[in-house]
Every structure is written in C-alpha cells, then in structure tokens.
C-alpha cells in the first residue's frame, strides 16, 4: 500500500525510541559484532556466509543458545553464570538431526567439548554439571524449538514460521541454511527460473517473514571457491549460487579462516589469544559500520565465541567507544534463586 505523510509525523517517536533503546536487539555472541550490528534486532534478516567446516551451524546454534537460555557454566570460574536472554527461539535444521543439535546445546551450556556427549565416560563432577544443564533445559523447554526440514520449500517455511510464532510467541528464528534442493526446484516446476532467481525469492521470503511477524531471522549460505583465497574484505561476490541473496538482508557477513600472514600479524602485537576466524562485515543497513573485519576465537567444540579485534581492510586496528547496552526485562524473575536451585542439584 502506498502511503504519503509529513516528514514530521512520528518524529517524536524516533527520539523516544532512542532514549529507550528500543531499536537495539538482544545480544548474540561477540561483543564487537553486537556493537557493529546493534544486536539481533526484530524485523531484520541476518545473513552469515562461510565455507564448509568453518562452523556456520555451530555459530548459529551458539547464538540461539545465548538467546534462549539465561545461564551457562563458566569452566574457568567453575560456576554457573547468568549470561543470556531467556527468549524464545526456533532452529530449523535442513541437514542436522535433532540429536546433533541437542549435543551442541549441551556442549554450549556445560562448556564440555561436544565429543564428550558422543563417547561418554563422564567424571563425577561432569555428571553433576550435566544434570544441572538438563534441569536448565527442562526449566526453559519452551524457549528452544528444533524443526527438522530436510526438503525445504518456500511455502513450507513460511507456513511453519507463521504457525510457530503464533503458537509459541517465538521472536528469533534460525534457518540453516539457504541452498538449492530438489524439493525447492520442484516448487517451481514448469516455471523458467534460474537457480540464482530461486535463491533470491527464498531470501526475500525470509525477509518478508521478519517484517510481517516482527521477528529476527538468521540464515546462512555457502561461499564460492574464491572466498578462502580472498585477503580483502569479502562481499556478496563470494556467495555461492546467487550474489543477489544479500539484496533483502539487513546484515551481511562472511566468515573464513585467517591466513598464516594474518596470524603472524596478531602474534607480532602480543595478543595472548590468536583469532581462528575472521568475519568480514560488508553490509549493515541502518548502521555506521561496514567494510570492517572482526577477528575472533571460536571453540567449535563448545560453540562459544569471543571477539578479539576490529580492523579495516588494511589490517589497521580500529579502537572505538562501546555504545551497545541491552537491558533485559526479566519480568520480576529472581534469577538468583534460580541459580541457587541449579547449584543445589548434585
């Protein structure tokens, strides 16, 4: 519907929103990333691209866990800590089984490598922490829904998301990941469309769902062969299948492994922890930051990530004032008492 209005109409709401931080989303993993994208804002589509084996799914599940669960175990201080938002999440898996996702969740919550949950042989201490993690998952079982969709279609995704948002009040949806499947091609049987056009239609549908339902939609894609060898800031030209996928996204980022030369640079500046992943931010709609690189360390065994440095394309470190602060409305829930109950579990 076409609308015409005065530029002044509603301007006071913008000032009020700024004062109340209503256009800031809840945190995802990574302090620098949150500063760049202003968190997981409702009504937006966040697109993360990477090659196979760089942890696209694990980063997504880690972000989903941080959003869904208020607590996780701090393995250094050996105690449970309140770090998370306690919001409702849905994870749509196109390749992983439910058990694979569940093992990742347990790894994130406990801080134990995921392989522990394949081979067992837990110590007495580990059994206690796992029991506590299971109690947390039970307490917040309405916060994390897993959907297996091995044969995705646009109409199926749209109907599913609308239904689950209505039934459970979900505000954060992870779709893993956008690709051309036989079922998706079958949806357009008899219509002369190229693969890149179909992928654009898929990403458009995800963005429309984000706006229509006022949710934050996360998704990911593969990258083409040029991405790993590119030492400049990677952009939509590195996306496999269709560079037009980014057209509807609000945030666009590509993750890759640092080169030896890049690691030597960070060794030279005396960093105690070397990054094992670099994320190139090439699109930020409604943001001041773009064409920057975030250097992080991610433990793929526990899905936990820490941002270390922010640089430009010339590898010059960017120092910036942090403005990202998100105040979570806990709705009068006393999480001190909840943590006390967790620690009482033996």
Set out the residue ranges of the language-model regions.
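Core recognition of P-loop NTPase motor domains used across DNA-transaction enzymes
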Residues: 1-43, 51, 76, 80, ...
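Cytosolic-facing regulatory segments adjacent to core modules
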Residues: 13, 31-35, 70-169, 289, ...
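Conserved glycine(s) of the Walker
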Residues: 55
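Phosphate-binding/switch loop-helix module in NTP-utilizing enzymes
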Residues: 144-209
């Amino acid at each position: 519907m076409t609308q015409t209005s005065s530029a002044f109409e509603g301007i006071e709401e913008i000032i009020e929103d700024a004062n109340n931080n209503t256009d800031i989303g809840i945190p995802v993993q990574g302090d620098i990333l949150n500063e760049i994208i202003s968190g997981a804002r409702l009504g937006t589509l966040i697109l993360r691209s990477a090659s196979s084996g760089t942890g696209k799914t694990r980063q997504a599940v880690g972000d989903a866990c941080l959003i869904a669960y208020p607590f996780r175990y701090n393995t250094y201080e050996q105690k449970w800590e309140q770090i998370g938002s306690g919001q409702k999440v849905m994870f749509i898996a196109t390749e992983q089984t439910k058990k694979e996702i569940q093992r990742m969740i347990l790894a994130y919550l406990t801080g134990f490598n995921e392989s522990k949950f394949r081979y067992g042989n837990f110590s007495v201490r580990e059994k206690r922490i796992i029991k506590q993690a299971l109690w947390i998952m039970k307490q917040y079982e309405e916060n994390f829904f897993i959907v297996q969709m091995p044969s995705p279609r646009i109409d199926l995704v749209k109907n599913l998301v609308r239904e689950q948002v209505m039934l459970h009040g979900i505000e954060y949806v992870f779709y893993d990941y956008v690709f051309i499947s036989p079922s998706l091609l079958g949806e357009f049987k008899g219509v002369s469309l190229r693969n890149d056009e179909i992928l654009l239609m898929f990403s458009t549908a995800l963005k429309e769902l984000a706006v229509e339902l006022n949710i934050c939609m996360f998704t990911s894609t593969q990258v083409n062969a040029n991405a790993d060898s590119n030492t400049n800031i990677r952009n939509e030209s590195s996306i496999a299948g269709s560079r037009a996928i980014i057209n509807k996204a609000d945030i666009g980022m590509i993750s890759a492994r640092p080169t030896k030369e890049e690691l030597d640079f960070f060794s030279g500046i005396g960093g105690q922890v070397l990054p094992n992943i670099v994320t190139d931010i090439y699109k930020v709609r409604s943001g001041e930051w773009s064409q920057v690189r975030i250097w992080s360390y991610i433990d793929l065994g526990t899905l936990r990530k820490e941002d270390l440095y922010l640089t430009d394309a010339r590898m010059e470190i960017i120092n910036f004032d942090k403005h990202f602060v998100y105040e979570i409305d806990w709705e009068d829930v006393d999480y001190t008492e909840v943590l006390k109950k967790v620690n009482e579990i033996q």
